[in-house]
Amino acid sequence: MTKPVPGTLQEGGAPFQTTHWTVVLQAGQVDADESARKALATFSETYWPPLYTFVRRRGYSPADAQDIVQGFFVHLFEHNTLTRADQEKGRLRTFLLGSLQNFLLKQRERMSAIKRGGNQQLVSFDLHLPETEAAMQATAHLDQVSCYDLTWASTIVKRSWQQLHQTLVAEGKAQWLDELKPFVAGVVAVPPNQEEVAARLGVPVATLRTWLSRLRQRYRELLRAEVATTVSDPADVNEELRYLHRVLMV
């Protein structure tokens, strides 16, 4: 599995943001409005890969794993499980895993009722299912929880990079972003030669290095901001960043 450049999950200065706890708690209320439900669907689409990976590693088939994850999300939101979460100690990563493990304990009793969440389709698996399956096969040497954590960390990194990409495309800088990605996100084992990349972009090497410095800083800020949405206490951001960095470096 591709590993990011060491340090990119350890630094950054973005301020703490509204957490995803807020989104899911609002969606879990009995009187939740349509906007809250849409936010809930977005939340489910974001975090299904690590949950799906964990269920698959428990020995379930792809079809059953999809049914279970779909049913799990419906169960969380329909039974107000999220409103009972202890946010004072809350990390979304560990809360969702613990809730899923509890859900699986009674899974057999629910199997007939949770087929793809009944009539509710919170998650669309088709688009990213092949890559999730491939990543799971590449981490067959890991235990279930480690595989979950690695998929979680990879999801955070992927979302951060997507946000960076969208921002720079809007600024008309998509070309040099594609050239510089190997230096920033560690998508190749050996980064390309800086002089060759500078020549392709038609800039001096010194300019390329300035761009790299700025790009890394923006990437770190986005990573930090993304992690901040998954913890209830801003003081936990640095520790969670360090933990995810260790997971990715295994």
Language model: regions and residue ranges:
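Intrinsic, short, N-terminal disordered tails of RNA polymerase sigma-factor systems
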Residues: 1-250
